[in-house]
Amino acid sequence: FNYTKLGTIIALAGANFFKSINIGLIPLMIIFILFSAFMNLFMGSASAKWNILAPVFVPMFMLLGYSPELCQLAYRIGDSCTNIITPMMTYFAVIITFAQRYDKKAGIGTITATMIPYSVAFLVCWTILFAIWILAGLPIGVNTGLFYPMG
């Protein structure tokens, strides 16, 4: 991204697009949470995903007036909820091995099918809690707000 400046170009284009459609904070964060959850199904490493997504989404959200911490919080919600259903997870083989102690036929499909309802429930509950947090205007951390002061 440094050589081509593609991250900056995508961030500017994305910020302009979201400004033009006048999307609110909560719908934007829900879209980002779902995108993060979807990306997690294909890439297991949270830090590698963040290294790919952060150069685009952090500046994009900052241009929209939202703090980088808010962006990372939304990313972590989406990322954490689908960890158990992605075969790309580092410990997926270990989980299958433990499950096979109790059911010799357990495999990838068994674990994924068993965990999808939990994953969806976590995703829905965390997203609702996140929306309530935003509506309440609570800070994310010490000296950290939801919004990024422009100029």
Q: Which sequence ranges carry the predicted segments?
A:
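Core transmembrane alpha-helical segments of multi-pass membrane transporters/permeases
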Residues: F1-I9
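Short amphipathic alpha-helical coupling elements at transmembrane boundaries
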Residues: I9-S20, V58-L63, T110-A113
